[in-house]
């Protein structure tokens, strides 16, 4: 995103244009998905809805009160539409969101990234209760720190983030057994493909 570092006034105007466009497009997408059968009414929203939200050079801009107020104004209709039509929403932060990393600096950046997604969910009206209306922010339990490090990091997240987080088994470092170790603390998502790659075991829909 080189344009974020060029011509500050132009970049800020582009930020306004992009955030407004993305929020409006999300509402239209939900309205389209609302025409599908109930079991298919789900949308995974993209992490890039707000450009550079966690970039060090842009954090102060995004945290300005007028920007935060505007984000809440334009994101609220997304949640309203989803609840009106029974569309389940989710986020899936990228591979660099490693809440169980052994490196403290990576954990700090990962918390910042996860809370960015929690901010968007909060503006949409989610996070007040445990996975309200099926909303989830799903991340892999990746990182060499495993379950113990993840649980320490979990306690540092905002209440809304803890209400919405789900953990998915990873294909490389932390498989199904590791995710089950945190099942008393957080909701789990089972990725059948990742489990097959990690263990060689295939789980079918008919298995007990």
Predicted features by range, described:
Residues 93-95, 99, 124-143:
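Active-site groove signature of glycoside hydrolases
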Residues 89-97, 190-193:
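Histidine-centered catalytic micro-motifs
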Residues 38, 132, 184:
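Structured loop/turn residues at beta-strand edges in well-structured enzyme cores
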Residues 141-143, 147-208:
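Acidic/histidine-rich catalytic cores of soluble enzymes
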Residues 1-88, 97-111, 119, 124-128, ...:
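Alpha/beta catalytic barrel-like cores
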């Amino acid at each position: 995103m080189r344009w974020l570092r060029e011509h500050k006034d132009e970049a800020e105007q582009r930020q306004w244009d992009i955030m407004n466009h993305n929020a409006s497009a999300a509402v239209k997408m939900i309205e389209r998905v609302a025409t599908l059968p109930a079991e298919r009414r789900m949308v995974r929203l993209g992490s890039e809805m707000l450009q550079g939200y966690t970039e060090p050079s842009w954090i102060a801009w995004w945290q300005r009160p007028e920007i935060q107020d505007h984000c809440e104004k334009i994101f609220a209709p997304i949640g309203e539409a989803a609840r009106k039509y029974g569309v389940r929403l989710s986020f899936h932060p990228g591979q660099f969101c490693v809440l169980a990393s052994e490196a403290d600096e990576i954990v700090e950046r990962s918390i910042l990234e996860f809370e960015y997604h929690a901010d968007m969910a909060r503006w949409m009206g989610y996070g007040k209760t445990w996975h309200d209306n099926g909303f989830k922010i799903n991340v892999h339990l990746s990182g060499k720190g495993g379950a113990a490090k993840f649980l320490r990091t979990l306690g540092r997240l905002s209440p809304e983030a803890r209400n919405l987080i789900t953990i998915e088994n990873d294909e490389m470092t932390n498989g199904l057994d590791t995710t089950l170790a945190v099942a008393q603390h957080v909701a789990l998502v089972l990725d059948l493909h990742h489990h097959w790659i990690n263990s060689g075991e295939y789980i079918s829909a008919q298995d007990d």
